Amino acid sequence: MKVTIVGAGNVGATAADVIASKEIAENVVLLDIKEGFAEGKALDLMQTASTKGFDSVITGTTGDYSLTEGSDVVVITSGIPRKPGMTREELIGINANIVKDVSENILEYTPNPIIVMVSNPMDTMTYLALKSTGLDPKRVIGMGGALDSSRFKTY
């Protein structure tokens, strides 16, 4: 199995670490727009393979969507976080452009992936990814509810 994670920040890098460590996928691609960021994260994570005992391969790339070709699952974590004073409408406007662009680039190399949306606001971004890709609704999944449930269980 091949999993691509778009967005190499805290959530994306953690997802890559868990997927590789548990050997959920043989190949994990970590993609980001910040020059060298995903490559550095991937290298850091790969250097833990000998101590964690996993054989998955993590590859980082700066915007090269060709490396995502053949992905079974694409996890989208990209977008900006909501800043103090920012309205949800402003966040939607910015992240909608990012998610639409990511979705179109992914489909160029992987025509029928399962998309797991993590970008905020998750419900709106999931709907946007569904509409912009034309994928079967069963292949576009929003992940926010599980995260919120986990947070509630913690407290």
Residue ranges and their predicted role:
Residues 16-17, 103:
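Generic hydrophobic/aromatic pocket-lining and core-packing "Φ" positions
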Residues 33-70:
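Conserved N-terminal Rossmann-fold NAD(P) cofactor-binding segment
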Residues 78, 117-155:
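Rossmann-fold dinucleotide-binding core
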Residues 1-3:
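Extreme N-terminal starter segment of soluble prokaryotic enzymes
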Residues 66-115, 125-128:
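Rossmann-fold NAD(P) dinucleotide-binding segment
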Residues 12-13:
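N-terminal Rossmann-fold NAD(P) dinucleotide-binding loop
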Residues 8-9:
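Glycine-rich Rossmann-fold phosphate-binding loop(s) that bind the pyrophosphate
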